[in-house]
Amino acid sequence: MGHRRLEVDGVSKRYGETVALDAMTFDVHAGEIFGFVGSNGAGKTTTMRIALGVLAADAGEVRWDGAPVTHRTRNRIGYMPEERGLYPRMRAGEQLEYLARLHGLSRSEASRATRQWTERLGVASRIGDEVQKLSLGNQQRVQLAAALVHDPEILVLDEPFSGLDPVAVDVMSQVLRDKADAGVPVIFSSHQLELVERLCDRVGIVRSGAMVACGAVGELRSGGAERILVDAPQAPPGWAAGLPGVTVVGDATGPTLLELAPGADDQAVLRAALATGPVREFARRLPSLTDLFRHVVSNEHTEHTEHVEDTGGTAA
């Protein structure tokens, strides 16, 4: 099972003049959590719908385990749509059993799986309630149960964490981790970048329908410009402004955050700081995923994919 992966290869989609996807390419390996981030309208949902076969691509292909995704494969995908797709007037438990049977489980298997997932997700006491009577957080939990109830081989989740309280986020995060550990490729989109940073093995940043950066979170972060946090309490304002290759990112009050151009001498920065008096802290700071995202999304000139590693796909 080690080599199984979901591949999105050169997928394009247009709506009239609007390019929704432009040769979108990436893959998600078995046992990996892949975070899909981008502004609204960047193409995340379109990509997911094409992967599911809900939408046809104009060009390119989606493969699972080396073969094009077919109706049979799609039956093995657990999907959580962004616009939640449960029947509002159906009881939560009946809804889950119905969906499980739709995916080929027997009545007793469907009932057992429904019990297992509603207990795991903390909504077992709600299975007799109509979906529309549940709180938003509990509707989310039932929606996740709907994606899991047929024991899928692949999980595709569109904004699964939106509207969840911190406890539910922890429960859902643990479920996704457990699924990945069991060898399932998990892909989810999210606007909560600190969550993506904490949870994902790899991240793809999408802009205007194309993948603009893709790689392990640590590699993407360390691939950014080097930053140094300097706490020199007696340093006058602007003490670092004239240093070669150094940009002051922030020093409103307290420690100064500096960005170093490639090849800039951090020891020269340290000497300049020591010349002002004591230095309490002098530490390298990696940019957060939020910083990277801002940089990539606002920087319209980086049109080429920065592939930090060989993901088996070609750069878009």
Protein language model regions, located:
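Solvent-exposed beta-strand sheet faces enriched in polar/charged residues
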Residues: 9, 231, 283-285
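ABC transporter nucleotide-binding domain
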Residues: 171-260
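Short, flexible helix/strand-to-coil boundary loops that buttress conserved ligand/catalytic motifs
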Residues: 73, 221-224, 296
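C-terminal coupling/interaction segments
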Residues: 261-316
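ABC transporter nucleotide-binding domains
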Residues: 3-6, 13-207, 213
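Structural motif
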Residues: 84, 244-247, 277
